[in-house]
Amino acid sequence: ALTATTPLAYGTWSPEERAAKRHLLERAGYEVARYFFEMRRTNLDEVDVPPMPEGLEIRPIGHDLPSQKQLWDADVEAFRGDHWGGFDASDANFERSMADPDHDPDLYVIAWDGDEIAGGVTNSIWKADNAAFNRRRGWLETVFVRRPWRRRGLGAAIVARSLVRLREAGMDEAMLGVDSGNPNGALGLYERAGFVVHTRSYAWRRPFEVSR
């Protein structure tokens, strides 16, 4: 429910190359609230793979619905409170993700601590896009580490293993998206893994008040 202290704002997005839209938004009183990058690594031949943190191991995730829901819930938990602007964690969105034709849990890299998911990368290959643009690109769709397992090098370990997984699937480049202001240092992690900024986009906000 809205309260007297709830911040309210109009919001929209624009890619960096849309200069006309940027000028229009500025004239309308919008300000850039956040920067988002798509990052690319163009060579998967040589990947520095660090050791896994002690007590953790990489194991497959089941294709069955309960296993996929366990992974979904772990991902949602990891991003809750850290994901700027919110995200759709609804059951309907989970069901849509399961129905995606490019959904392939065999590409995922999941770190386990016993029966608990400590972190993971949901990798994907967009087959139709690759065919249309004659490329072999894989995506690190989501990268997450749950709070009890952070600051141990797990993020670097699963990102590197994801690059290897995509290479083994026949890809020669990898992409991911990142919030430049991610509070857990995701941008630096990806830069150290060999990613460079490929495209930029802006999140715009313009505050407004509601008459009460």
Over which residues does each language-model region extend?
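Conserved acetyl-CoA-binding loop-helix of GNAT-fold acetyltransferases
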Residues: 1, 141-145, 151-168, 173, ...
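Conserved hydrophobic beta-strand within the GNAT/NAT acetyltransferase core sheet
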Residues: 10-12, 140, 174-178
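Conserved active-site tyrosine of GNAT-family acetyltransferases
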Residues: 21, 25, 190, 195
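A conserved beta-strand-loop-helix scaffold within acyl/acetyltransferase catalytic domains
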Residues: 82-143
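Short glycine/proline-centered loop/turn elements that form peptide/ligand docking sites
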Residues: 159, 182-186, 203-208
